[in-house]
Amino acid sequence: MGTGPLTSGVRAGGGNTGWLWMSSCNLGSPVLPISFLFWLLLAAPGARAAGYKTCPPTKPGMLNVHLLPHTHDDVGWLKTVDQYYYGILSDVQHASVQYILDSVVSSLLEKPTRRFIYVEMAFFSRWWKQQTSATQDAVRNLVRQGRLEFVNGGWVMNDEAATHYGAIVDQMTLGLRFLQDTFGSDGLPRVAWHIDPFGHSREQASLFAQMGFDGFFLGRIDYQDKLNRKKKLRMEELWRASDSLEPPAADLFTGVLPNNYNPPKYLCWDVLCTDPPVVDNPRSPEFNAKTLVNYFLKLASSQKGFYRTNHTVMTMGSDFHYENANMWFKNMDKLIRLVNAQQVNGSLVHVLYSTPTCYLWELNKANLTWTVKEDDFFPYADGPHMFWTGYFSSRPALKRYERLSYNFLQVCNQLEALVGPEANVGPYGSGDSAPLQEAMAVLQHHDAVSGTARQNVVNDYARQLAAGWGPCEVLVSNALARLSHYKQNFSFCRELNISICPVSQTSERFQVTLYNPLGRKVDQMVRLPVYEGNFIVKDPHDKNISSNVVMVPSYYSETYQWELLFPASVPALGFSTYSVAKMSDLNHQAHNLLSRPRKHKSHHVLVIENKYMRATFDSGTGLLMKIENLEQNLSLPVSQGFFWYNASVGDEESSQASGAYIFRPNVGKPIPVSRWAQISLVKTALVQEVHQNFSAWCSQVIRLYKGQRHLELEWTVGPIPVRDDWGKEVISRFDTPMKTKGQFFTDSNGREILKRRDDYRPTWTLNQTEPVAGNYYPVNTRIYITDGQMQLTVLTDRSQGGSSLQDGSLELMVHRRLLVDDDRGVSEPLLETDTGDKVRGRHLVLLSSVSDAAARHRLLAEQEVLAPQVVLSLGGSSPYHSRATPKTQFSGLRQELPPQVHLLTLARWGPKMLLLRLEHQFALKEDSDRNLSSPVTLNVQNLFQTFTINYLQETTLAANQPLSRASRLKWMTNTGPTSYPEPSKLDPTSVTLKPMEIRTFLASVQWQEHRPA
């Protein structure tokens, strides 16, 4: 077996002890709650038989070929989730997950040497609930013996370009918790498995490492990168996935699979394949065993040349394979027997059923020194002119709906945690966060939020989100009634983005409650559609505050034309309630008059400004021409406008067309939507706006609120016209004279920042075939350029593709509509309905000094992702209980969190348990002006108002292992030795967060009983 690997904590394969109460704290009674004890029992490492200990024996001195039987089951793509599970619409795609799992389990039970891996808990959990107790017991035994192994373990195999890190963590937690609850430590995945996502982010690897994974296997990487890795024997190495976290916290061993995730040529034995079976009867005229064995031996020898050890893998399966598992296993049984029989003739090839975990174990035991990777795997191309950078922006409406749903889910989770059981059963009925949790998890799938599914499947994704919002709205209503001591008919305006809200538009009086999911106070301008008139707005202390009614541009809404504006201040993790009343005609002059946009005369200089910022517009073109930071005395010429790339349908150089996945413009220079904009101006005491109309399908409002340190650009694009038979990919572009040396910066899943360079890859010499598409990168929350003194940052409200194709330039793709499929399997052009979609979104623009930039964009991006939730009511309802005094303002925290600290997760985990994640949201050395990149310490024990923490247990990021007992394999690298410190004992009164560190806790709590005021 060779020398065993080094491990931290318990030895691989488990020990004989359960969880010790290490890295935890007893804050109250010495008796642990039953739910907590049950959780400890499930996660006891002493029970971990399924892991490295159950791996099959290999043969030293031979080339060991690990066959990895697997299926790749998309959670929606050409068919919906339900259609895939049940096997509906076989004429679209022959695929049925329920039959796959039935068949695999049956085949595994036939022979003890057979093995299989499974990934998607969205499917497996559904199948599991439909099984008999006998079948469940049989599956538990298979898992315990390592014959059925779970890899990844998330609800889905998530996308890595269009996903926010918080949503990734949530979906992984959901899937891994199902495995923990169902199989205990036997079901603990040790390996991450992303074989189909179209490029890989550095933050994804960091998150996996923090979840306790030992390794990460990839299917798709750039074709040039792969060739280079094969030549340099770098198909496997250590990914150091953070510049801030001290190694090995974000280190993850990463391997590139030899054949994406498909079986080798001629060795596909699924009902969906056409390769002949193994015929081992020499009397048969179809006898092919000898030929297949010789082919296999040559294939194994050739593949070994690209890897460093005497172990290699072959993925035996593909999309929705194993519906008839017997076909696969019967032929692999023969292959294994026939190939291994050649050892008596001198063959040095040993083939075996295996799993990614067992393969990783052998690599670790080899005790080699591995190279280190520090960048990411974007952008991905599978051939010349074939860059998968279009999906960064595909289906922007779905991308925004997903981001809004993440926002609302955190609100729902937090209120459920703050209030406890009364949020689930209250005056408005039964509330539940689970449906939205599951819908959001499904949306992280690499064909969901990516925008790469068929239109009917996209519609179904939206349906799932909408269905999840309902139970959460009930829960939020119950919780707000409990916290405010008042029962009201709450209304959730889901269509505020298109200026529709029936309560505010039809009511003479109403109340506006804003819940703030951040751990710090937030000031925000509220905008609500109203019918023409003037209004009095009162704050939570019943004092009149400033408000304005402004006209909405006619190209925004055909029905309602006015919006009410007022400034709101909402405490940390709490709410504020404002009352609104329409004034009678007699009182109009006592309040601000309505503000209508005024046509701008070209000979006047056009400026909008407040005490912090000024934006100047070209009076001839109507375009933005300069931004000034008055606070820091910075001025930058900035021209912003909308352009579109003419989408390729294929040409003489390549047949590749632009599509849902691929971005390929016909030419490198985009076409302006218009070289000028028709403009009008709104100026009130609260806001100054320039309304720009570029065309019938493209408009924008550039606004500056009172006291705001950033410029807001609210764009409306679509339906994109295609009657000219030209597909169009629309960008918003900012041009400046900044000298940026061909460099720009993008975020990785909303967290750490990566430097990008045009026409450059850090680990190989790039042959650039697409100078536009090949320089596009995913932008989840921000992109910026800098000259070393000033920094221009643009924040997004959804994931988009972005780049800087010329010095001082920055562009983001906001919408795309295409007429041709890109030949990647969807077989449907990205038309988005017959007429196309109209999409509205926001870009927030910051101009600041480099030293101050991080403090600005970190906090603003956090507020953009987790904005206050607006809830309306008519007021005047009954008290929550007798003698209750209504509350119009509330905070769930005893004190605000420091600006460095983000409350990433606060959610119910059990009847008396909560899940808590605290995050340091600044990178190392990122902020010097305010010292925000320094470690910060806080008291968790006395942090919350509504409950008392009795016990606190620190866990890995996905909350499925105690941190003190988490065991990860150790690896030697060419960068030198790495220290492996033991987790320190937890003191809940003094929890320290280092830059970019996330700490995860499970807490046993007691909610306060409500007392009549």
UniProtKB/Swiss-Prot annotation:
Its EC number is 3.2.1.24. It holds the Pfam family Laman-like_dom. Binds 1 zinc ion per subunit. Zn(2+) binds at H72, D74, D196, H446. Keywords: Disulfide bond, Glycoprotein, Glycosidase, Hydrolase, Lysosome, Metal-binding, Signal, Zinc. One of its GO terms (molecular function) is alpha-mannosidase activity. GO terms for cellular component: extracellular space; lysosomal lumen; nucleoplasm. GO terms for biological process: learning or memory; mannose metabolic process; oligosaccharide catabolic process; protein modification process. The active site is at D196 (nucleophile). Glycans are attached at N310, N345, N367, N489, N497, N544, N633, N646, N693, N767, N931. CDD domains: GH38N_AMII_LAM_like. Disulfide bonds join C55-C358, C268-C273, C412-C472, C493-C501. The keyword Transmembrane helix does not apply. It is an enzyme of class 3 (hydrolase). Residues 1-49 form the signal peptide. Its cofactor is Zn(2+). It is found in: Lysosome. It catalyses: Hydrolysis of terminal, non-reducing alpha-D-mannose residues in alpha-D-mannosides. Its main location: other. Necessary for the catabolism of N-linked carbohydrates released during glycoprotein turnover. Belongs to the glycosyl hydrolase 38 family. This is Lysosomal alpha-mannosidase. It comes from Mus musculus. The gene is Man2b1.
